[in-house]
């Protein structure tokens, strides 16, 4: 981290010490009623009764459990034990299967490793950085601090995001380009960029031949070179001026 705080270290104190933080269990029987504080014993009994009534009404499989990717192995084990032993079914999942597993598979298939192919130090050697669909200042302040340092040294930044994130313009840092695309058109914008790279002869052929499947690359290059993928052709879709 080199002296910089991570997300939890930088922001966790805000909600941990917030005056509105709930510190005791509360129950209400309807949305129109105010919350009332109860003991932990009453809270557990109330929750158990509600879960039991759901199964009685809708069947054993009506309840499942899903854990966070930030749970420890022990916590995840306890959740699956609860679902199987107490609720009597196998409806157990984890959000990592939805978010990280597809990412890892895609990275492995494309780049040969299921993790990022660069390290934080690489940003210190970049001349142009592209930030797409991310807000490093809030989501990863350690990396954002190092990126801002490099930008202050003269590197250029391209932000591709519908939002005007902090990096678009902040003290001593300003993006050279902000492509405020319409939500959901990321692929179209990236394909249009690839179209320009391929059709204007900007491909580093030696690099691609060394590191990629050249036959597959040629198939892809022919696809993105189609006039349908030109920046002018997708401008109305993406909202990004050609």
Question: Which residues does each predicted region cover?
Answer:
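N-terminal export/assembly segments and adjacent metallocofactor-ligating motifs
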Residues: 1-200, 215, 220, 241-242
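Histidine-acidic residue clusters that define the catalytic metal-binding segment
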Residues: 36, 229-237, 241-242
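Internal, active-site/partner-interface "lid" segment
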Residues: 201-234
């Amino acid at each position: 981290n080199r002296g910089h705080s991570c997300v939890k270290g930088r922001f966790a104190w805000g909600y941990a010490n917030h005056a509105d933080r709930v510190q005791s269990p509360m129950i209400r029987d309807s949305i129109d009623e105010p919350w009332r504080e109860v003991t932990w014993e009453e809270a557990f009994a109330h929750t158990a009764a509600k879960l039991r009534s759901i199964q009685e009404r809708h069947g054993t499989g009506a309840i499942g459990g899903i854990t966070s990717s930030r749970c420890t192995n022990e916590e995840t084990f306890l959740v699956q034990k609860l679902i199987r032993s107490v609720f009597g079914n196998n409806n157990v999942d984890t959000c990592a299967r939805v978010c990280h597993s597809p990412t890892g598979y895609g990275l492995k298939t494309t780049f040969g490793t299921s993790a990022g192919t660069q390290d934080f130090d690489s940003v210190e050697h970049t001349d142009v950085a592209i930030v797409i669909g991310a807000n490093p200042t809030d989501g990863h302040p350690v990396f954002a601090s190092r990126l801002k340092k490099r930008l202050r040294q003269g590197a250029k930044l391209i932000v591709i995001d519908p939002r005007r994130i902090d990096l678009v313009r902040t003290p001593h840092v300003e993006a050279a380009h902000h492509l405020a695309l319409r939500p959901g058109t990321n692929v179209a914008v990236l394909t249009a960029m690839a179209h320009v790279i391929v059709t204007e002869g900007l491909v580093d052929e030696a690099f691609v031949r060394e590191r990629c499947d050249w036959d597959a690359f040629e198939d892809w290059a022919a696809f993105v070179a189609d006039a349908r993928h030109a920046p002018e052709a997708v401008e109305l879709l993406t909202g990004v001026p050609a």
